[in-house]
């Protein structure tokens, strides 16, 4: 059997399932792989219990379940939906079950940062494994140590290659400087700056309580520069907006915010609408409809589609850490 026939046979044994969290992304991954989504019904009873039905055989199949951590419904509903889907595939005799979770739920609760605090990201890892998951694919975990919470393989893909392409082709690249909005993201931004051969700056923020920034101090010169403010996620956008103000006050020409996970909860949209940002860019790891003239999006469905193809065929995914498939 030649390699082409072997690959065709392998692809035919993939089953793609999708929950309700991000149907658009699931459809894009499906189209790029050339594999239709399997028939799945997800319903809620009147008492809000979730019920799942799978409309075709999964026996001895390599199953990939696409379900991101955030959507139009509550995060806990999507998590429970995912767990039930995994369990349904398990008892349907699937050979292998891989969960594709572009935005990992509870990723910010990754450590015991105060007395009696739970490590909820570890709990989610336990739940996924108990339900029957054999492998996890995700992107830009808020804390990379979450991979160590699992006893099964975890592939933490990077949005970085796609972000690099965006910066090179859709920004004032020659006059740009990369900026980290906090010390925690400095390593990420420094790595990007090295690859782009650009300078970078850092904003040190002092918090009084969660989601509330009291003071920001800029380290670096941004005068007359196009500032590319890079972070892994934007939630309430308080940090991004205040960081933008700080940069503009220090003479920046413009500020473009680029994030992997655009959560945009609470009053985030209103903050962005009234901000001095020239552009807010996010990937489609979560469903986003900002309806703002300054909004732009990076499609990461090719990365997930290629990861699925490579994993299924037993190929390395390390190529995706440095290259963005099209």
From Swiss-Prot:
Mg(2+) binds at residues 140, 142, 151, 155. GO terms for cellular component: cytoplasm; ribose phosphate diphosphokinase complex. It comes from the Eukaryota. The keyword Magnesium applies. PROSITE patterns: PRPP_SYNTHASE. Pathway: Metabolic intermediate biosynthesis; 5-phospho-alpha-D-ribose 1-diphosphate biosynthesis; 5-phospho-alpha-D-ribose 1-diphosphate from D-ribose 5-phosphate (route I): step 1/1. Its main location: cytoplasm. GO terms for biological process: 5-phosphoribose 1-diphosphate biosynthetic process; purine nucleotide biosynthetic process; ribonucleoside monophosphate biosynthetic process. Its EC number is 2.7.6.1. Keywords: ATP-binding, Cytoplasm, Kinase, Magnesium, Metal-binding, Nucleotide biosynthesis, Nucleotide-binding, Transferase. One of its GO terms (molecular function) is ATP binding. SMART domains: Pribosyltran_N. It is found in: Cytoplasm. It catalyses: D-ribose 5-phosphate + ATP = 5-phospho-alpha-D-ribose 1-diphosphate + AMP + H(+). 5-phosphoribose 1-diphosphate synthase involved in nucleotide, histidine, and tryptophan biosynthesis. Active in heteromultimeric complexes with other 5-phosphoribose 1-diphosphate synthases (PRS2, PRS3, PRS4 and PRS5). Present with 5280 molecules/cell in log phase SD medium. PANTHER family: RIBOSE-PHOSPHATE DIPHOSPHOKINASE FAMILY MEMBER (PTHR10210), RIBOSE-PHOSPHATE PYROPHOSPHOKINASE 2 (PTHR10210:SF32). Belongs to the ribose-phosphate pyrophosphokinase family. This is Ribose-phosphate pyrophosphokinase 4. It comes from Saccharomyces cerevisiae (strain ATCC 204508 / S288c) (Baker's yeast). The lineage of its organism: Eukaryota, Fungi, Dikarya, Ascomycota, Saccharomycotina.
